[in-house]
A protein has these predicted regions:
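Conserved cytochrome P450 K-helix/beta-meander segment immediately N-terminal to the heme-binding cysteine loop
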Residues: 117-146
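Cytochrome P450 heme-binding "Cys pocket" and the immediately downstream C-terminal segment
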Residues: 170-204
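Active/binding-pocket-proximal capping segment
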Residues: 70-71, 98, 129-140, 195-196
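Cytochrome P450 heme-thiolate monooxygenase catalytic domain
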Residues: 1-20, 171-174, 219
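Central I-helix of cytochrome P450 enzymes
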Residues: 14-68, 175
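Active-site-adjacent bridging/hinge elements
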Residues: 20-27, 144-156
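Hydrophobic, well-ordered secondary-structure elements that form the walls
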Residues: 81, 112, 161, 167, ...
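Conserved cytochrome P450 K-helix E-x-x-R motif and the immediately C-terminal K′/meander segment
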Residues: 68-107, 111, 116-117
């Protein structure tokens, strides 16, 4: 059977975002977005959720706020956790001739050239204050401090503009619901020490460089 369509659900929002595009490009775009969401929910979503939990277990004050009903704090919290552990690769198309210096060499890039950039290179280094986890960097899902950077794209979680991940809202909702239920129903105790993103990972949200066990007991 086919489940009834819920008004305003994720699929409906995807369809609306392609409403201005003529057929068959519209249907192709919708299908591709659905595939991206499916792939993300199988891998990167769980990594993002895990890092949110890891950072959260170091902040008992935030856990108590969630237990008191403040689920909204998980929105900026999860975005900051993803910023710190993002390892995605993004292709940038050169739109004007530029000279790119690399050590002693200079590369002349012409319009149309595709350059691969790693979010992890600038997410924590574009400014000194980005090196540490700070929930105040985000207001909800918005990064208001982008005006303090040379370019807003230097810090990325779910992408910018047309490159924004179509699973953004879904992922944030899933993380918020899962983590809030965990901390309300269980006492959690980390059985790991100082995990870091795997240094050689390319693409997606990082996996941890070690096993991260968590002991739990029902509240």
């Amino acid at each position: 059977c086919i489940a009834p369509r819920a008004e305003g659900d994720l699929f409906e929002r995807i369809c609306e975002s392609w409403a201005h595009v003529p057929s068959p490009e519209r249907e192709i775009g919708i299908a591709r977005d659905v595939i991206v969401i499916h792939m993300g929910s199988q891998a990167n979503l769980f990594a993002a959720m895990a890092w949110t939990l890891i950072f959260l277990l170091a902040r008992p004050d935030v856990i108590e706020r969630i237990r008191a009903g403040d689920d909204g704090i998980l929105n900026p919290f999860s975005h900051e956790a993803i910023r710190m552990t993002q390892r995605s690769i993004v292709l940038r198309r050169v739109v004007a001739p530029i000279d790119f210096e690399q050590g002693n060499a200079i590369h002349h890039l012409l319009p149309g050239t595709l350059v691969s950039t790693m979010m992890s290179v600038t997410n924590t280094t574009a400014a000194p204050w980005l090196a540490k986890f700070d929930i105040s960097n985000y207001r909800g899902s918005v990064f208001p401090r982008s005006r303090e950077l040379a370019a807003p794209e230097l810090v990325t979680t779910y992408g910018h503009g047309k490159h924004t991940c179509p699973a953004h809202r879904f992922s944030t909702s899933a993380i918020t619901q899962a983590i809030s239920e965990l901390v309300r129903h269980f006492d959690l105790e980390p059985r790991y020490k100082d995990p870091h993103p795997r240094p050689r990972q390319l693409g997606g949200v990082a996996r941890a460089d070690r096993l991260c066990k968590i002991a739990y007991s029902r509240r």
